[in-house]
A protein has these predicted regions:
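Short alpha-helix within the catalytic core of nucleotide-sugar-dependent glycosyltransferases
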Residues: 36, 71, 109, 113
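Short aromatic-enriched loop/helix-cap "lid" or pocket-rim segments at secondary-structure transitions
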Residues: 7-9, 54-59, 98-99, 141-142
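Short amphipathic alpha-helices and their capping/turn segments at secondary-structure boundaries
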Residues: 38-39, 72-80
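Catalytic helix-loop patch of NAD(P)-dependent Rossmann-fold dehydrogenases
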Residues: 2-49, 58-69
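Feature marks short, surface-exposed loop/turn motifs that line or immediately flank catalytic pockets
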Residues: 3, 51-54, 134-136
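C-terminal substrate-binding subdomain of Rossmann-fold SDR/epimerase-dehydratase oxidoreductases
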Residues: 76-203
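C-terminal catalytic core of Y-nucleophile DNA break-rejoin enzymes
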Residues: 68-71, 104
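A short alpha-helix capping/helix-coil boundary motif
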Residues: 12-15, 51-55, 122, 150-153
């Protein structure tokens, strides 16, 4: 995440950046710094955690054999009949596991359309959080996936993973107000669509 490990939640667009927890997070911070130094009109969309796929199961993320994101990890665990590793359960969160703001990729795509249309009408530099505003833990995601797809996951808890932000979720009031955009898909939609895409890839 561009915010690092924030002190106050939810994060707004005015929340100061903390130290990036990974090279990926650092690139996000540097890209925004470059845009701020340029004369280019721009919209920076600060994604939170995109998940899901198109409900048709025809468009999705073809992850590597060793995915690093939670939902692809879950799906690969099921398809390969292997045990999944939860990276730490001793964080200061509601159940000890990391907390994220998960957003369906279809909602995310719609936010891009809204942002481009807004930039046509209102030039300048704009920044928006793109999330749902809800913090969900790793263990909660596992339970949601199991319930939505009637699947029992095999997992164990291991040590923390370097570079993981403990907890972050968005205040989306700015994008709701200015772009008239808000997430519509539920987490259950995300779980069903993710598993549908994974099954379709194996055919």
């Amino acid at each position: 995440t561009v915010y690092g490990n924030p002190d106050i939640l939810p994060v707004t667009e005015e929340t100061p950046f903390k130290a990036a927890q990974s090279p990926y997070g650092e690139t996000k911070q540097k890209c925004e710094a470059l845009l701020n130094c340029s004369s280019i009109d721009s919209v920076s969309l600060r994604y939170f955690n995109p998940i899901g796929s198109h409900e048709s199961s025809l468009i999705g993320d073809r992850s590597t054999d060793k995915p690093s994101n939670l939902i692809p990890i879950i799906c690969k665990s099921v398809t390969n009949n292997t045990q999944m590793l939860v990276h730490g359960d001793d964080y200061e969160t509601k159940d000890g596991t990391c907390v994220r703001d998960y957003i369906h990729v279809v909602d995310l795509a719609k936010s891009h359309v809204a942002a481009l249309n807004y930039l046509i009408l209102k030039q300048g530099k704009h920044v928006y959080n793109v999330g749902t505003g809800n913090g969900v833990s790793v263990l909660e995601i596992i339970k949601l996936f199991e319930d939505a797809n009637d699947i029992k996951l095999d997992y164990e808890v291991g040590p923390r993973r370097e570079g993981d932000v403990v907890e972050v979720y968005a205040d989306c009031s700015k994008i709701n107000k200015e772009l008239k955009w808000s997430a519509e898909k539920t987490l259950e939609n995300c779980m069903v669509d993710s598993w549908g895409w994974e099954n379709n890839m194996d055919r």
